[in-house]
From Swiss-Prot:
This is Biosynthetic peptidoglycan transglycosylase. It catalyses: [GlcNAc-(1->4)-Mur2Ac(oyl-L-Ala-gamma-D-Glu-L-Lys-D-Ala-D-Ala)](n)-di-trans,octa-cis-undecaprenyl diphosphate + beta-D-GlcNAc-(1->4)-Mur2Ac(oyl-L-Ala-gamma-D-Glu-L-Lys-D-Ala-D-Ala)-di-trans,octa-cis-undecaprenyl diphosphate = [GlcNAc-(1->4)-Mur2Ac(oyl-L-Ala-gamma-D-Glu-L-Lys-D-Ala-D-Ala)](n+1)-di-trans,octa-cis-undecaprenyl diphosphate + di-trans,octa-cis-undecaprenyl diphosphate + H(+). Pfam families: Transgly. It comes from Acinetobacter baylyi (strain ATCC 33305 / BD413 / ADP1). It comes from the Bacteria. InterPro entries: Glyco_trans_51, Lysozyme-like_dom_sf, PBP_transglycosylase, Pep_trsgly. It is a single-pass membrane protein.
Amino acid sequence: MKRFIVRAVLILVSFVLLIQLWIFCSLAWWRTHPVETTMFMRLDYWSDSSKPIQQQWRDYDEISDNFKKAVVAAEDGKFVHHHGFDWEGIQYALEKNEKSGEVVNGGSTISQQLAKNLFLYNQRSLIRKGQEAIATWMMERMWSKQRILEVYMNSVQFGDHLYGVEAASHYYFHRSAQNLTRDQAAFLAALLPNPKYYQENRNDPRFKFKKRFTLKYMRYSEIP
């Protein structure tokens, strides 16, 4: 029995280490190569393979600064200053969730969201949050802030089977991400992090509030 337990533990540890090696190798490759698919894209496609995934890579300089500032204002105002985790934001989210009795604020940074999008899934669990933290830690040490924001903008979801700011710009506004206005950039940023719902419910008061908030504060956003 003891031998069986030891063997089971060794197998589990080996499996966990293999996952970390896969994440490390993926991050090393993606330092200089476009990200063509993510775990979220795969899961979305597997849920309905009749619809193609819409996504088109754009380099950092080919994306409007309006959107860069908008997404930082909407999702992670301290993006250029933290090392992957906004501890004050996490504390605020915990207090807000405790008061409401449910999860209404996640407190995740852009780096954490990207780690989840690239490698994990959306269901909340301690195991997923732990793996997300490890992937975020590795990413922040292997990639520059500019690279993190570049990959995030190209891989984040903006609707059903719709990923990346270029595909979203064409879907919602029939223009390239390079030519987004401030209002259009704020609209796209406000879709996050619940794009499938807001894609069909653009009159939701929460969406309108987030768009106004983003428009107001994006002028103060610091981008890499």
